[in-house]
């Protein structure tokens, strides 16, 4: 039994422990094995000799007959996956093994992320969220600017993943300055500044988007996620939009990273494709700078391009960075310069960011430091030079495919030709119907058929 050893106390209540009281538990009342554990420790040799005697008998502890016979050999149990047993009315969705759930549900999730979230379709070069934004803006279009918050709310009828993803995608489209005309503070890709809140900025479709992106007669439609609305499967884009804008996305097991290309070069290359000539495309960046495309390899997997900032030497104590590499920002570039200076890799006096309409980062040098050597050090140890690995992955026939940018251009050009042919056929049918109706009216009046009615 458990006993309490407490010193005498003058307090009237003797049932509570006082400071300094000790508690002694008689472990032998519970189990001889527990009592043996409570004894003074013995040597390892004594423990080995006594272990056999302890395991030779069944411990009469609190678990009673639950204690296994030590002498009995336990055969290894072979792990086998049992087939799911179905009760009346149950289906595989009600009863499934863990392995089956992993194989089916994870693959379904991965396929959904690839096809419906991260990777663009080759037909129009758009991700689903971008396509739904443009479709919602087309429905709202009356020639005037709309609040971005209003556009986001309209798009949520088609995109079931929340306002944050829609807002980020719309800002990204607006910063490319191709499909959307913007009004207000939409941020700056050069400095890394974010856009203002959606209730403060406005947007509308550009004239270019209205001309080359939309045509309800040649659009294939599908039901929205809740079945209440119609949305386009793909938009009838008559331009290599994917190569003009570029895109970046991360899915389950793969990613895509397509560089933007020059608008005029894409038009010229499309004409060359129609004439059967060989074409070769290289990226073009709105941030300027220098680009080494020696290992571009049509933007396929394993490709690599090097990007450099443009550095101007003003005098012996001043360098000015005029352009920054694509994907970097002036803030990140300045931080990399400061870190390199703190690590004694470059010697600078001060870094000042005077970026306004154009990028201007002043790098002031101490007296006696070579500006040429400092420029080399800036390229070697800072973000004045970075590398990017393109990876052209697009959705073709509902499957992700890795192709080159020239292949994307050829398929886009062929799709544009088919769309134009289809539009001409529709226009021809409309004109024939109009001519036919006009001819019937003429016959009706000239022959005075109305008198017979």
How would you name each of these model-derived features?
Residues 2-302, 362:
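Catalytic phosphate-handling regions of large nucleic-acid enzymes and associated NTPases
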Residues 61-99, 106, 114, 118-119, ...:
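Long, charged, helix-rich clamp/arm modules that form nucleic acid-engaging surfaces
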Residues 204-209, 213-216, 332-336, 379-386:
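Long amphipathic alpha-helical segments
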Residues 236-237, 302-310, 341-349:
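Short amphipathic beta-strand starts and helix->beta connectors
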Residues 238, 295, 305-309, 317-323:
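Conserved catalytic-core segments of large NTP-driven translation/proteostasis enzymes
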Residues 266, 333-336, 374:
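Hydrophobic side chains in well-ordered alpha-helices
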Residues 274-278, 341-345, 379-387:
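A common structural junction motif
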Residues 316-354:
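Long hydrophobic segments that form regular secondary structure
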């Amino acid at each position: 039994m458990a006993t309490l050893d407490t010193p005498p106390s003058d307090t009237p209540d003797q049932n509570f422990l006082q400071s300094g009281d000790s508690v002694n538990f008689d472990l032998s009342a519970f189990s001889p094995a527990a009592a043996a554990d409570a004894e003074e420790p013995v040597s390892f040799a004594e423990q080995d000799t006594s272990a056999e005697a302890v395991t030779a008998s069944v411990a009469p502890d609190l678990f009673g007959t639950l204690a296994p016979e030590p002498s009995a050999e336990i055969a290894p149990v072979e792990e086998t996956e049992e087939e799911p047993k179905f009760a009346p009315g149950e289906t595989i969705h009600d009863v499934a093994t863990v392995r089956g759930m992993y194989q089916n549900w994870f693959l379904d999730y991965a396929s959904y992320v690839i096809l419906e979230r991260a990777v663009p379709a080759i037909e129009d070069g758009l991700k689903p969220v971008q396509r739904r934004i443009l479709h919602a803006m087309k429905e709202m279009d009356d020639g005037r600017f709309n609040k971005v918050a209003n556009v986001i709310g309209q798009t949520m009828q088609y995109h079931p993943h929340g306002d944050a993803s829609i807002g980020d995608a719309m800002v990204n489209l607006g910063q490319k300055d191709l499909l959307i005309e913007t009004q207000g503070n939409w941020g700056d890709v050069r400095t890394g500044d974010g856009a203002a809140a959606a209730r403060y900025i406005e947007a509308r479709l550009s004239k270019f988007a209205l001309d080359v992106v939309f045509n309800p007669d040649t659009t294939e439609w599908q039901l929205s996620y809740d079945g209440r609305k119609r949305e386009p499967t793909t938009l009838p884009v008559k331009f290599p939009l994917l190569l003009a804008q570029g895109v970046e996305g991360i899915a389950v097991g793969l990613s895509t990273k397509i560089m933007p290309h020059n608008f005029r070069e894409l038009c010229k290359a499309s004409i060359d494709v129609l004439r059967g000539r060989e074409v070769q495309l290289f990226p073009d960046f709105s941030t300027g700078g220098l680009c080494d495309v020696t290992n571009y390899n049509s933007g396929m997997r394993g490709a690599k391009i090097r990007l450099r900032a443009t550095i101007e030497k003003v005098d012996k104590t001043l360098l000015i960075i005029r352009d920054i590499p694509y994907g970097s920002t002036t803030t990140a570039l300045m931080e990399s310069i400061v870190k390199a200076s703190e690590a004694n890799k470059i010697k600078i006096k001060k870094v000042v960011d005077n970026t306004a309409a154009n990028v201007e980062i002043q790098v002031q040098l101490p007296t006696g430091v070579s500006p040429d050597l400092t420029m080399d050090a800036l390229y070697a140890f800072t973000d004045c030079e970075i590398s990017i690995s393109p990876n052209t992955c697009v959705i073709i026939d509902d499957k992700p495919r890795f192709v080159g940018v020239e292949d994307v251009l050829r398929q886009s050009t062929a799709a544009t030709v088919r769309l134009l042919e289809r539009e001409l056929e529709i226009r021809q049918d409309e004109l024939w119907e109009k001519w036919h109706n006009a001819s019937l009216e003429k016959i009706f009046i000239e022959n005075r058929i109305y008198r017979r009615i």
